[in-house]
Each structure stands twice: as structure tokens, then as C-alpha cells.
Regions:
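Active-site bordering "gate/hinge" segments
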Residues: 1-172
Length: 172
């Protein structure tokens, strides 16, 4: 998801706006909306723009390895989780949702006081939501995992088995 968040002081009030549409026409709309929002604020509390700190810790949330994960690898992991879950016990009847997803992006924060910070990030996650039925009762189980850097750290077998055990534990 990409977007731009904007805030500014107008008539001594802080106005906010946001858009996911990033083009030339959005700039004026962001400013106008922030001004309108500032005018509608009824509180008298003053807000200030943060000038920034002298030093920021480096946070590394980017992994080239995650960037290079292919869609085929993600699909393979999702199908594997589904198959494992369905083999845990005969009462596990259906996988409702199963996914393996990667994302990457960049964040920037800047203001008129000189603050300008940018960082890139990647992450990958896998999860499964399933249903078990013992003939009289139905229960669901869910499990997922997430990592910033190492897809290998996600144990798809463990995720599938935990979700199945959760559903089974809710039966009878």
C-alpha cells in the first residue's frame, strides 16, 4: 500500500490529510483537505511540528533475500501448509484460508524544520485458518508467523500443525 500523509498548521491548528493516489493533482487536494480539517478542530491545544533529533538509531528491516522470493516459492509454501494441516487428523476437514505473502516498501518522513528520514523494509508472512469437525461439533484454528528478513525462519509445518491442534482442542 502506498500513500502520502500530510499535516500542517493552519490558523494555529494542526490539519491532517492522507491519500493513496500519488500524482500532481493530489498535492493541492492534500493541502486543501488539511486546511479544512484544521478549521474543523474545536480543541485549543497547540501542536508543533517536530524538528527532529540529533541522532537516530539505524533500524535494518530490509532484506534482499526477501525481495528475491519468487511467487512460485510462496505458492509452494501455502500449498504445503494446506496439505500438512489436512493430514494432521481426519477431523481437520477444510482449509478456509492459507497464504504466504511478501511485501516491501519505503517510508519517508520530512517536514519544513529539516527533518528528513527514509527507510526501506521487507517482510514475509505465512498463515492458515482451518476448520475441524468431529461429526457433532465444528471448530476453527488459526496460526501465522512473520519475519523481516529470513523466509527460512518461517516453519510452515509448525504453523499448519498448530492451527490444526488449536481447532482439534476446541472439539468435544
Amino acid at each position: 500500500q502506498k500513500g502520502i500523509s500530510f499535516r500542517g498548521i493552519y490558523k494555529e491548528k494542526m490539519g491532517y490529510s492522507y491519500t493513496e493516489k500519488i500524482d500532481e493533482t493530489s498535492i493541492e487536494l492534500l493541502v486543501v483537505e488539511a486546511m479544512e480539517n484544521a478549521e474543523s478542530i474545536e480543541m485549543d491545544d497547540k501542536e508543533e511540528l517536530y524538528a527532529g533529533a540529533q541522532h537516530y538509531e539505524t533500524v535494518n528491516q530490509y532484506s534482499e533475500a526477501v525481495t528475491n522470493i519468487s511467487p512460485q516459492e510462496l505458492i509452494k509454501v501455502a500449498f504445503s501448509m494446506e496439505n500438512i494441516a489436512l493430514q494432521v487428523h481426519p477431523f481437520v476437514k477444510r482449509v478456509i484460508q492459507c497464504s504466504a505473502v511478501k511485501s516491501e516498501g519505503e517510508r519517508s518522513i520530512a517536514n519544513t524544520k529539516g527533518l528528513h528520514c527514509t527507510s526501506k523494509y521487507t517482510n514475509v508472512s505465512a498463515g492458515i485458518y482451518l476448520m475441524a469437525n468431529d461429526g457433532t461439533q465444528t471448530a476453527t484454528g488459526y496460526e501465522s508467523d512473520f519475519t523481516w528478513k529470513d523466509f527460512v525462519a518461517i516453519d510452515s509445518k509448525e504453523i499448519a500443525e498448530k492451527a490444526a491442534r488449536e481447532a482439534l482442542s476446541k472439539l468435544g
